[in-house]
Amino acid sequence: MTPPSNSSGTQDTLIWGVRPAHYAMLGVALVTLFRLWYMCRFDLTPDEAYYWVWSKHFALCYRDKGPLVAWTIALGTKLFGDTVFGVRFFAVLLSAGTTFQLFRLAQRLYDDRTALWCFGVGEIIPLLSVGSILMTIDPLSVFFWAWGANLSWQAFETGKMRYWLLLGAVIGLGFLAKFINAVQLVCIALFLCWSRPHRHFLFSRHSLATMLAFGVASFPVFWWNVQTGWLNVQALHDRSGINHSFGIHLNEVLRHLTSQLGVITPLLMIGMVIATVGLWRNQCDQARVKYLLSQFVPIQAMYLLLSLNSRVQPNWIAPSLIAGIVLLVAFWRQFIVRNPKWCWVAWVSLGMGLVVTLALHVAAFFPIPLKYDAFHKAEGWRSFAQHVQQARQQNRTDLLIANYYTQGSMMQFYLPDHPVTYLPPATYGNSQFTLWPGYEVRHGTRALYVVDNKPQLSEKVKDEFNHWRLVDEFWSEFHGRHIEHFFIFLLWND
């Protein structure tokens, strides 16, 4: 890494006669073009297909998540059709936008070269790189978090009301994608409490403007919840594990920590922790360090505490990586200037991140164990749909029923006519499918029931149909590899 500038702001430095911003722009353009090509090399993931089904049922919110992912997919498929490209198009653009916001944040807080290094590190962290081509809630969440981080610093530095209003709107839009984005308001409040020069903003017309803008932007979620009996609260309650008695599960904490080492890579994650502690101890008097710590530590601490009681998914900490990357680069650039012999550690860490990220991208095209294939959930669905379509044609069925939203969503996306699919009847609010009209069984109704793993019928399905038989058992395949085991039953009433 090159030595850092002594300035605390943006500088027009040159690298081989070219500004770092121009290198970053070229890098973003090349990476974006690659991702637009690569994202069509494999099928949708179950969550992507599920959100695509949501996009066909416009609503102000959905049972499991906010509405923005469905709205974004609806726009993508409006432009490019119901295709993998249409579903994922905006994921790639959002990732490019996130990279730009990361670069600008580091540029504002430090200098051009620090910003360029942050761009490079962001591209080789597996969690961010792999997630950049999947149209889930994460590209939206991370983009709006990064934009909010930039806007809040602009708001603090300038005091201009337009930045405070836009900040609230951006955090509100992030909330429409992923509810964790509201925590950014807490992060900002913590910084304002911590930083004496900025403390006057804590209770002011500026912060009030931010809260009002956030309320307006996030209003669809609250209005939908009022109408549906706060289903989002129920879903969050179920996923968090707090509906069970609290207990300390050290194995879950260990699982959480090891998963972070995996999705960030061990050396980069350890380097991030060292940077956090080092800057906290030695440069905590700087407003920019306080700000970055306020954007990084709360999310990490919250999920670490949550892992004591329940399982935490590796991708949940993704928004915190925006500040984490800047902390990492800022600390280690300064440290290596003082201790040049440690330069090899930085290069090994970057090299490991690059190798892991490249390996994850090419793994799907080689016969490796599924547990090492980052995209295995997005493989085999075309062959799955071929088996279902063959069973439909052979048995002349009226309905398609799945035991889980994964199969139901994939059948609806990959079958040629995009038929409406159903899940067995369940309690209202149990899943998004329960909020839509269900199927009706009459005399002579014939249906296919698609299940995974075990050839079992649910009791509710048995109650609705008086005859059933297994008509197909198969493995979905991708490049000659077995991916997942499925069973298709024919159900009928006579």
Regions found by a protein language model. Give the residues of each.
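Short helix- or helix-capping micro-motifs
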Residues: 28, 118-126, 171, 175, ...
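Membrane-interface transmembrane helices that cradle and orient dolichyl/undecaprenyl
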Residues: 107-113, 148-164
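Transmembrane-helix motifs of polytopic, lipid-linked glycan transferases
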Residues: 89-109, 147, 151
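Short acidic/glycine- and proline-prone juxtamembrane loop motifs at membrane-interface regions
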Residues: 127-141
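Membrane-proximal, lumen/periplasm-facing interface regions of secretory-pathway glyco-
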Residues: 314, 339-396, 405-436, 449-494
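Hydrophobic/aromatic-rich transmembrane helices and adjacent perimembrane loops
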Residues: 58, 270, 293, 297, ...
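Transmembrane-helix signature of polytopic, membrane-embedded enzymes
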Residues: 11-12, 21-22, 102-124, 143
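Transmembrane-lumen/periplasm boundary regions of multi-pass, lipid-linked membrane glycan transferases
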Residues: 173, 184-295, 299-310
